[in-house]
């Protein structure tokens, strides 16, 4: 909070005169010598992976075996069906649904992913979850076992 009381030295006119004299000492509105800002350099972010839930490492620090395991997970995740959230046209589904990972309500048109146990989540939320743990966050059913068994029955 500032001081509300006027003092004889802090009136608007004296402040105006001080700022004009300051500008004159720098050469009429020019700034003192400054270097130009450095050129913009875009840094490409290095992906961060979680080989196990308790470990976080940059992609460049992973062993070949860990890179293969992550590539396999990404391949399995891409085989899970995805869609767009549509609460239903007839209004029969009146309860509010939310993604249990981010705790945000689903909005019409949100990209979602379906797990074999029929739970749905925001696409980005569940993909990130499955990179850490390949189980459903709601029922803890292993996603890879259900996914692999669906290929065996066909």
Curated annotation (Swiss-Prot):
A GO biological-process term: protein autoubiquitination
Record-given protein name: RING finger protein 11
Lipid moiety-binding residues (N-myristoyl glycine): 2
Listed PANTHER family: GEO07743P1 (PTHR46359), RING FINGER PROTEIN 11 (PTHR46359:SF1)
Function per UniProt: Essential component of a ubiquitin-editing protein complex, comprising also TNFAIP3, ITCH and TAX1BP1, that ensures the transient nature of inflammatory signaling pathways. Promotes the association of TNFAIP3 to RIPK1 after TNF stimulation. TNFAIP3 deubiquitinates 'Lys-63' polyubiquitin chains on RIPK1 and catalyzes the formation of 'Lys-48'-polyubiquitin chains. This leads to RIPK1 proteasomal degradation and consequently termination of the TNF- or LPS-mediated activation of NF-kappa-B.
SUBUNIT field: Interacts (when phosphorylated) with 14-3-3. Interacts with the E3 ubiquitin-ligases NEDD4, ITCH, SMURF2 and WWP1. Also interacts with the E2 ubiquitin-conjugating enzymes UBE2D1 and UBE2N, but neither with CDC34, nor with UBE2L3. Interacts with ZNF350, EPS15 and STAMBP. After TNF stimulation, interacts with TAX1BP1, TNFAIP3 and RIPK1; these interactions are transient and they are lost after 1 hour of stimulation with TNF. Interacts with GGA1.
Organism in which the protein naturally occurs: Mus musculus
Entry GO CC: early endosome; nucleus; recycling endosome; ubiquitin ligase complex
Bias kind Polar residues: ranges: 1-12
Phosphothreonine found at: 135
Transmembrane segments: none
UniProt PTM: Ubiquitinated in the presence of ITCH, SMURF2 and UBE2D1, as well as WWP1.
């Amino acid at each position: 909070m500032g001081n509300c009381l006027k003092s004889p030295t802090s009136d608007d006119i004296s402040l105006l005169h001080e700022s004009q004299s300051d500008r004159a000492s720098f050469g009429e509105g020019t700034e003192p010598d400054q270097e130009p800002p450095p050129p913009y350099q875009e840094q490409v972010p290095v992906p961060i992976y979680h080989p196990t839930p308790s470990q976080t490492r940059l992609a460049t620090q992973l062993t070949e075996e860990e890179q293969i395991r992550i590539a396999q997970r990404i391949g399995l995740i891409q085989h899970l069906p995805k869609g767009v959230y549509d609460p239903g046209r007839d209004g029969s589904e009146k309860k509010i649904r939310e993604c249990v990972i981010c705790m945000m309500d689903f909005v019409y048109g949100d990209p979602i992913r379906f797990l074999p146990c029929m739970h749905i989540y925001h696409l980005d939320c569940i993909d990130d979850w499955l990179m850490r743990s390949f189980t459903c966050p709601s029922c803890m059913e292993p996603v890879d076992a259900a996914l692999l068994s669906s290929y065996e029955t066909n």
